[in-house]
């Protein structure tokens, strides 16, 4: 189940929304499944694309603070774009992708990339990466959603995570108008 939280309401001040999100994730109850059916916590944090750098800076600060041992949880930050690029590089697909796009077009390359990454499957490369790299007692931040579009769409990530990934609350950050 994907839910919103009071910091997801429309507010004019992004800094205030980020402050509210930061306070919320630091509460012990945030890491507990507390819904009607004891579902995992999935949260969406949308922001105007022009505020991307401010959001990135806040996430970096939170991660650095967390790495210093300031919290009683681990903050696991994953950039979905970086996961996709790393996969393509490890398989030596990057140059092939560039050539394929030149010959067949962008729409065809998005389809071609989604097949080996299993974007539509519960065992997608992204879900597997998140499962393998998320420690116990963690909060997961998903970033890079805007950079992946339209190759990978955020709802596919959430659908796949909902089926296969239940050990940590997930906060997905994505730019939206």
PLM region descriptions:
Residues 80-84, 146, 173-177:
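Short beta-alpha junction loops
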Residues 75-123:
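Long, charge-dense
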Residues 49-54, 83-85, 116-121, 146-150:
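Short acidic, S/G/P-rich loop/turn micro-motifs used as interaction or catalytic elements
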Residues 135-151:
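Conserved P-loop NTPase "ATPase switch" module shared by AAA+ and STAND
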Residues 12-67, 75:
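Glycine-rich P-loop/Walker A and Walker A-like loops and their local beta1-loop-alpha1 context
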Residues 162-177:
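Short, flexible loop segments at boundaries between secondary-structure elements
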Residues 149-165:
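Conserved Walker B catalytic segment
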Residues 122-134:
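Mid-core helix/loop region of P-loop NTP-binding domains shared across ATPases and GTPases
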């Amino acid at each position: 189940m994907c839910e919103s939280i009071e910091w997801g309401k429309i507010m004019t001040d992004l800094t205030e929304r980020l402050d509210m999100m930061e306070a919320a994730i630091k509460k012990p109850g945030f890491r507990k499944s507390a819904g009607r059916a004891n579902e995992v916590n999935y949260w969406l944090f949308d922001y105007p694309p022009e505020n991307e750098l401010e959001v990135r800076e806040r996430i970096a600060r939170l991660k650095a603070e967390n790495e210093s041992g300031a919290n009683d949880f681990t903050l696991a930050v994953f950039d979905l774009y970086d996961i996709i690029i790393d996969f393509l590089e490890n398989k030596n697909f990057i140059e092939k992708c560039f050539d394929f796009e030149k010959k067949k077009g962008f729409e065809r390359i998005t389809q071609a990339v989604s097949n080996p990454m299993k974007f539509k499957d519960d065992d997608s490369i992204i879900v597997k990466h998140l499962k393998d790299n998320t420690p116990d007692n963690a909060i997961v931040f998903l970033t890079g959603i805007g950079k992946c579009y339209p190759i990978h769409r955020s709802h596919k990530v959430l659908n796949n995570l909902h089926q296969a990934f239940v050990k940590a609350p997930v906060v997905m950050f994505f730019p939206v108008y």
